[in-house]
A protein has these predicted regions:
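Hydrophobic alpha-helical segments embedded in the membrane of multi-pass proteins
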Residues: 18, 40-42, 168-179, 191-201
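Membrane-helix/interface signature in polytopic inner-membrane proteins
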Residues: 140-173
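Transmembrane helix-bundle core of multi-pass membrane transporters
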Residues: 7-8, 79, 87-147
Length: 201
């Protein structure tokens, strides 16, 4: 009745939505939508490095996005710049570097529209495997840090006083966001990932 590519697209979309829903709750509660945009923009650099080094795209995006997230956390502690200024600086810097690298990789053909908006109909069996292994793993880790993350969302000082280590929970949460971006970038695209984090929540 349905073609294989339609079934794969449906299964992939459901897998991503199941993960982005719980993550998106904290994105909304902690007002991190622009933070998600920053990680999504940095993913372009991860994609270009994956193509240039013939590396796995999802793993490359995860590494680059995680590094950007952890750098951002450290910069927020060590600088007087407003948070939104740091987000804009990192988002557009990583996006610009990614576009420059694409310009130099003339021997590789890039599907820019696919990178920006995704192509869910091009989902392969390997993509489904990554989504349905990576997704539950992200949810499992989120469950483990749910209490300190939720407590610090309500009241950071109280969570710290109770010894819940909110800074560690925040760092782990940013890495989880990098993870969902990595496994969904092919299907959703750079520009729509933040929407997938917010809308299901």
């Amino acid at each position: 009745m349905f073609d294989d590519f339609f079934i794969r697209a449906l299964v992939a979309g459901l897998g991503i939505a199941f993960v982005t829903g719980p993550l998106g709750c904290f994105v909304i509660w902690r007002r991190l939508s622009y933070f998600g945009d920053t990680l999504a923009h940095s993913a372009l650099l991860g994609v270009t490095l994956a193509y240039s080094l013939e590396f796995n795209i999802a793993l490359s995006v995860f590494i680059i996005s995680s590094l950007i997230a952890l750098i951002l956390i450290q910069l927020q502690k060590r600088t007087n710049l407003p948070g939104d200024a740091l987000l804009g600086l990192l988002a557009h810097s990583s996006l610009a570097v990614g576009l420059v690298v694409i310009g130099f990789l003339t021997f590789i053909r890039f599907d820019i529209m696919g990178l920006l908006f995704g192509d869910i109909l091009a989902v392969t069996a390997d993509d489904l495997l990554i989504i349905w292994i990576g997704g539950p793993l992200i949810l499992l880790i989120l469950k483990l840090i749910w209490k300190p993350l939720f407590a610090s969302t309500v009241n950071y000082e109280l969570a710290e006083a109770e010894g819940l280590n909110p800074d560690r929970a925040k760092a782990v949460f940013t890495v989880l966001m990098a993870g969902i971006i990595a496994i969904s970038i092919k299907m959703v695209g750079l520009l729509l990932i933040t929407g997938m984090l917010i809308i299901p929540a």
